[in-house]
Amino acid sequence: MVSDFESTLQKDSHSKSLVRGGGVHPLTLDAMNYLSNLADYSHILEDIFAEWPPPPRSSLPESYFDTPQSDDSQAPAISLRMAWLILVLLCKLDGKAEHYKDVSLSYIFLTNNLQHVVSKVCTSNLRYLLGEEWITRHEAKARQFATNYERLAWGKVAASLPENPTAVISPAAAKEIIRKFNLSFEEACQKQRTFVVSDPKLRDEIKESLARKLVAVYREFYDTHRLTVGGERNVGSYARFAPEDVGNHLSDLFFGTTESVSSPSSSSSSSHRRRLRFRS
């Protein structure tokens, strides 16, 4: 039964199927449901897996368990087997992420799916088979994927704001900064309006991180320079978004809505090439 499951994972006939918005893939849902249910019978499976040859040591990342790499022989056979099966799943998901044309969406996909894997481990008997070190390691990896998403998707928006938002500059320069920020922010929101973050806690964490990087700086710049560019009425002629509007639009992200932020603006998918790996 377990051999059949691993074979199904390895073959994965839908390897090029993409989930809209970068959400959790059906393969992830099915595989983790199966493994979490299987973990409930660990007391029976221990003796069975003890007779199986262990996965190749080179295929398991360093620090994969609480037990040091040099002492893998002490890890229960069932723990090694569960870790191996999840690793096979993660490698398949890594390959699926490569099929997204938008690199930032690839990282949303990786974040969502790894977060689901970790969540299922934490809320099942897999937690006791894999150990706290495994959980900590993969939680950190999910956060890194989210950080990579923020950098790729919102880096241009953040870069449009000055490092010192209260520095004295000319009205023309202030007007141009506000204009560029509004344009890049609108483009980013438009591009990502269908993106999904499935886990509510993770969704809020990403929004809060973006708000710290964008809303706070933009608000400080906006409040400092709106009078120098001619007052509230004048700034509204080229600033589509006030600071509170930026916060509101960020709050609406990651639910997979198809509503447009504004009239569609052209934006090309990133051609940035990458290797996205769950493995170390």
Residue ranges and their predicted role:
Residues W134-T136:
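Short, charged, amphipathic alpha-helical segments
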Residues M1-L129, F221:
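Extended alpha-helical solenoid scaffold regions that build the rod-like backbones
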Residues G95-H99, L114-V117, T123-L130, A140, ...:
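Extended, charged coiled-coil "stalk/tether" helices of large eukaryotic trafficking and scaffold proteins
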